[in-house]
Amino acid sequence: MTKSPSRLAEMRFQMTALSAQLRWGTNLELEPVRRREGELLVCGMGGSGISGDFLQAVAAAEGRRTTVHKHYGLPGWAPSLRPSVVAVSYSGNTAETLSSWEEARKLGLQVTAITSGGELAEMAALAGEQLVVIPRGYQPRSALGFGLSALLRVAAQAGAISDPQPSLEEAAHLADSLSGPKGEGIGFASELASAMGGRMVGVYGSVPLTQVAAYRWKTQTNENAKRSAFWSVLPETTHNEIVGWDLPQGLARRRVGIVALRDRDEHPGVSRRFEVLEKLTADRVTWVGEVWTQGFSPLGRLISLVAMGDLFSLELARNSGADPMAVDLIDRLKEEMHTSADSAPEEPSGF
């Protein structure tokens, strides 16, 4: 792989749009829908599916529940509990999400589509179901703000969460201040990436909030930096995974770097576990650094970590000369799936 400043600059430009994308959602006008029944079920894969994970965390902070489905069809309980379904696919051609849409329609469930076009938009329009069209022209993983803000607005309309407008505004401000053109997080992300070096990236989050951001960091590292990475969640990690760092001759310390994502409202027990875990494993694995949430609302705090993780992944790409735009193996997998199984064509960029 060769270093491509223009490709890196293009992805960097797309990432700086996070703030504007979130603000786009505050001005979104939604079509009225009939009264929804049951809990909200979000169906989507990759970057679309992760918007459901963010919604789930925001709803949980309000004492409410939503469910995310990242598979073909619908969960086995859907026919009896009859959820309201939101199908999210940036391209509108994601095979698993189209399968979920078709199953929901067969069951006569209330369905909303969030997409930039493709088959999903066509089916929603033909069926007369609620359709939220988001702007095209982005790499799907750099269009999180569009899908997430639209999903939050739909969820609020359904009564699954409270009005997200204030938290969207806060999140947009944080995204701009951290990862905008003059973002204050750029220098720290560069230092973090340099400290990581060529190690495998491990990202530790915690229940209930930063675990979602940890997964985003992991997937952005995979796609932008072309780097193997993993994520894990406290407190569960301290009951199993940590034993795996007890390798001979400092093997893990040389090859693995851990970034801890911390939140000011994390459980005191989790805070203590982070401290003790680092103390006990400091000679076994490299703790590269901590990144703390900023902001007040659950959404704002999550977006602050998203902004930093996006910057971190791009700095890793810069340091190694990786092309952050390409996802060749994903493209090849989808071509093989389409050729061998007569499946719907999917978007070429991962979700």
Q: Predicted regions span which residues?
A:
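Polybasic, low-complexity association/targeting segments
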Residues: M1-R7
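Active-site phosphate/pyrophosphate-binding segments
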Residues: R7-A9, F13-Q14, A20, W24-V33, ...
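Short, hydrophobic/amphipathic alpha-helical patches that form generic packing surfaces
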Residues: Q21-W24, A150-V154, V212, E223, ...
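Glycine-rich phosphate-binding loops that contact phosphosugars or nucleotide phosphates
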Residues: R35-L178, D263-E266, S271-V285
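A generic structural motif
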Residues: H69-Y72, R227-T238, W287-F296
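Short, surface-exposed amphipathic charged segments that create phosphate/polyanion-binding patches used
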Residues: S84, G145-L152, T219, I242-P248, ...
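C-terminal active-site/capping subdomain that shapes the small-molecule cofactor and substrate pocket
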Residues: G244-D328
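Short, small/acidic-rich helices and loops at N termini and domain boundaries
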Residues: D323-F351
